[in-house]
Amino acid sequence: MKAAVVTKDHRVSIEEKRLRELRPGEALVKTEYCGVCHTDLHVKNADFGDVTGVTLGHEGIGRVIKIADNVDSLKVGDRVSIAWMYAACGNCEYCTTGRETLCRDVLNAGYTVDGAMAEEVIVDANYAVKVPENLDPAAASSITCAGVTTYKAVKVSGIEPGQWLGVFGVGGLGNLALQYAKNVMGAKVVAFDINDDKLNFAKELGADAIINSTNVDPIEEVNRLTNNKGLDATVITAVAKTPFNQAVDVVKAGARVVAVGLPVDKMDLDIPRLVLDGIEVVGSLVGTRQDLREAFQFAAENKVIPKIQLRQLSEINDIFDEMEKGTITGRMVIDMKSTH
């Protein structure tokens, strides 16, 4: 079968791979679609360590074509996800308290185990979440990581109906954060970016305000919008240091700043302000299986509509080049059905 494999020179090679036999508790999935995430770029570039030889992809959607022994959660024909959280131990303090994404023994698709940019992929049946049949599978691929990650982050922000939430970076993740915040949580949303095309798209999606941080002072604009109060919370999906710092600067006392993007950098934190204003800065890592079920359902109800563009597996290096240049709006999704 064809698979997108990480090479030593930080590129991706389309190679023929052969899967091992299924083990108890596993299922074999024929991949239909796989979204391309910024984390895939980090993995390819060895930012998290060298994983030469691994098959990329953790925004996969496909149909179960075979199940192993001891599998009763799935059946042949089910449409399921192949997500970043491939499997966890199920027994630790995190797994038993609803925080399974923090499991120290977690396996990650497309990083520590082979992922979904392949014609077929092996999944842990207990961690493959079923996809609603009325949800377009190509759109569902974007929800599998970008969607659940931003949905969880918006939940972590504690935002309430009518409050102001700032979303920093409105690309593949941020446009979904905007939709979950506005259409599910009932928040007022300010979109921050340095790309006018992405900001205009955010406005089309319903952003209450858009701010190009290179043209205006974000603090001044937020003060104007909120009568000098500041935002109630911010979510950062951008992958640069500056927006992380700005996201702290524009919030009010008692606000929560949720970090999602993964720039290889460090934040500059004004400690006296954090302490005196009681500002919380927290990280949010993807989402649990239950978060993913909820995120899928909101998409199936058309409350969240991912903007996607179908691409071919052979274009994967071009997609990464575009990603590094910051020219992508929405989500690139590999049409794996065209490779079968």
From Swiss-Prot:
<protein>
    <recommendedName>
        <fullName>Alcohol dehydrogenase</fullName>
        <ecNumber>1.1.1.1</ecNumber>
    </recommendedName>
</protein>
<dbReference type="Pfam" id="PF00107">
    <property type="entry name" value="ADH_zinc_N"/>
</dbReference>
<dbReference type="InterPro" id="IPR036291">
    <property type="entry name" value="NAD(P)-bd_dom_sf"/>
</dbReference>
<dbReference type="InterPro" id="IPR020843">
    <property type="entry name" value="PKS_ER"/>
</dbReference>
<dbReference type="InterPro" id="IPR002328">
    <property type="entry name" value="ADH_Zn_CS"/>
</dbReference>
<feature type="binding site">
    <location>
        <position position="103"/>
    </location>
    <ligand>
        <name>Zn(2+) 2</name>
    </ligand>
</feature>
<feature type="binding site">
    <location>
        <position position="95"/>
    </location>
    <ligand>
        <name>Zn(2+) 2</name>
    </ligand>
</feature>
<keyword id="KW-0520">NAD</keyword>
<dbReference type="Pfam" id="PF08240">
    <property type="entry name" value="ADH_N"/>
</dbReference>
<dbReference type="GO" id="GO:0004022">
    <property type="term" value="F:alcohol dehydrogenase (NAD+) activity"/>
</dbReference>
<keyword id="KW-0862">Zinc</keyword>
<keyword id="KW-0479">Metal-binding</keyword>
<feature type="binding site">
    <location>
        <position position="145"/>
    </location>
    <ligand>
        <name>Zn(2+) 1</name>
    </ligand>
</feature>
<dbReference type="GO" id="GO:0008270">
    <property type="term" value="F:zinc ion binding"/>
</dbReference>
<dbReference type="InterPro" id="IPR013154">
    <property type="entry name" value="ADH-like_N"/>
</dbReference>
<keyword id="KW-0560">Oxidoreductase</keyword>
<dbReference type="InterPro" id="IPR029752">
    <property type="entry name" value="D-isomer_DH_CS1"/>
</dbReference>
<dbReference type="InterPro" id="IPR013149">
    <property type="entry name" value="ADH-like_C"/>
</dbReference>
<feature type="binding site">
    <location>
        <position position="92"/>
    </location>
    <ligand>
        <name>Zn(2+) 2</name>
    </ligand>
</feature>
<comment type="similarity">
    <text>Belongs to the zinc-containing alcohol dehydrogenase family.</text>
</comment>
<dbReference type="InterPro" id="IPR011032">
    <property type="entry name" value="GroES-like_sf"/>
</dbReference>
<feature type="binding site">
    <location>
        <position position="37"/>
    </location>
    <ligand>
        <name>Zn(2+) 1</name>
    </ligand>
</feature>
<feature type="binding site">
    <location>
        <position position="89"/>
    </location>
    <ligand>
        <name>Zn(2+) 2</name>
    </ligand>
</feature>
<feature type="binding site">
    <location>
        <position position="58"/>
    </location>
    <ligand>
        <name>Zn(2+) 1</name>
    </ligand>
</feature>
